[in-house]
């Protein structure tokens, strides 16, 4: 809930964050919350099946949402050099919600002045998960009899990926 509150402050009262002396420390906390934590994963028995639950997913989504909000509301106060590697790890995740947020962040970075220079050194790291997402999702839709909702979700993910590539 702290990250959601931070996102609200960044969206509506970003001048409070900009004037804060610990603004740069805030980025370190956000980056720390984008990491996958194994201690927040658990396995649930569902009769003959076992399902892995990632309790850290909402935290990671909230952290990436805060980053996106800060890029949108106060781009001049954001040092995009700091989170290119975190962006690559977010693109490599299994969860499509996190990937879509990272694609959106990538598009925002490319729209910023001279921000393309930030992503070019790590372009290979970004393209591997991007290509994997496109190929895997297309393969999944074509080989399975997916329902309309999952087809739409895959379509949105692919559209976000293509838009991110186009922005580069």
Write out the residue ranges for each language-model feature:
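Extended repeat-based solenoid scaffolds, especially LRR ectodomains
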Residues: 50-67, 73, 77
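HEAT/HEAT-like alpha-solenoid repeats
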Residues: 17-51, 77-91, 117-135
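Acidic, Ser/Thr- and Gly/Pro-rich intrinsically disordered linkers and low-complexity segments
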Residues: 33-59, 134-159
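Hydrophobic residues within the alpha-helices of tandem HEAT/HEAT-like
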Residues: 2-14, 30, 66-72, 90-91, ...
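Alpha-helical rod/repeat scaffolding segments in eukaryotic adaptors/tethers
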Residues: 14-16, 49, 112-116, 120, ...
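Walker A/P-loop NTP-binding motif of AAA+ ATPase domains
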Residues: 2, 41-42, 62-65
């Amino acid at each position: 809930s702290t990250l959601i509150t931070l996102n609200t402050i960044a969206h509506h009262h970003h001048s409070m964050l900009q004037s804060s002396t610990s603004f740069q420390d805030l980025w370190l906390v956000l980056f720390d919350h984008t990491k996958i934590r194994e201690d927040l994963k658990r396995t649930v028995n569902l009769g003959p099946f076992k399902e892995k639950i990632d309790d850290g997913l909402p935290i990671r989504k909230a952290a990436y949402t805060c980053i996106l909000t800060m890029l949108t509301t106060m781009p001049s106060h954001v040092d995009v050099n700091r989170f290119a590697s975190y962006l690559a790890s977010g693109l490599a995740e299994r969860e499509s919600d996190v990937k879509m947020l990272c694609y959106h962040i990538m598009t925002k970075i490319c729209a910023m002045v001279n921000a393309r220079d930030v992503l070019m050194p790590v372009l290979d790291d970004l393209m591997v998960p991007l290509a994997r997402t496109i190929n895997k999702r297309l393969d999944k839709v074509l080989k399975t009899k997916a329902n309309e909702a999952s087809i739409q979700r895959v379509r949105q993910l692919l559209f976000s990926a293509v838009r991110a590539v186009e922005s580069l």
